[in-house]
Amino acid sequence: GSGANIAYTPTTTTTYYAESFITPTSYTFNYTGGMQTYTVPMGVTSLSVDVYGAQGGFGYNVPTIIPGLGGRVQAVMAVTPGEVLNIWVGGKGGDGGTTVGGTAGFNGGGTGGGWSGGRSGGGGGGASDIRQGGNALSNRVIIGAGGGGSGVNHSSGDAGGNAGGLNGSNGLTGTYLGSGG
């Protein structure tokens, strides 16, 4: 897929469980590249959520070097009936090109490092988050961080780091240094 998911349901990427006086209802939010909303049903005062960040992108021409996976957060959050939650599902980091690093994953991923020598690193995956009481970064209450993009060097690469903080940082741009003769 092209991104992570947020859902109200067990064992899916980003999951919310709305528990009320009736049978619990499950909702899943998939990557769209934009904000989505969820209105808390009447009678519901807490949600069980399962949030995954998106994975990073692959380095150029090194499909066996795996990028980092997004983080996972499971929590129960207090809500108010009728409240509107803002849902942001992170996008997968772009794969590295011959000279240009992979694009940053939607919602906070970092750009992969570029290299003029013909191989560039993958972009970092975007975070998935739930925002309560507004849409600013300071309104984030649950965050599944995105994973790091995989790197490359002259003949191989390094795996991407698994999820970290709120925003990924840009990859480093480097040069290959050969030994002198």
What are these regions (language model features)?
Residues 4-8, 36, 71-75:
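Short strand-edge motifs at loop-to-beta-strand transitions and within beta-strands
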Residues 67-180:
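Secretome/extracellular-domain signature
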Residues 23-34:
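Boundary/junction segments of secreted and surface-exposed precursor proteins
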Residues 19-21, 52, 90-92:
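Beta-strand-rich extracellular modules
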Residues 41-48, 80-84:
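Extended extracellular/luminal ectodomain segments enriched in beta-structured repeat modules
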Residues 13-17, 46, 84-86:
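Short, conserved beta-strand segments of beta-strand-rich sandwich/propeller modules, principally
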Residues 1-21:
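Solvent-exposed segments in extracellular or luminal domains encompassing
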Residues 1-2, 64-69:
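Short beta-strand segments within Ig-like beta-sandwich modules, predominantly Fibronectin type-III
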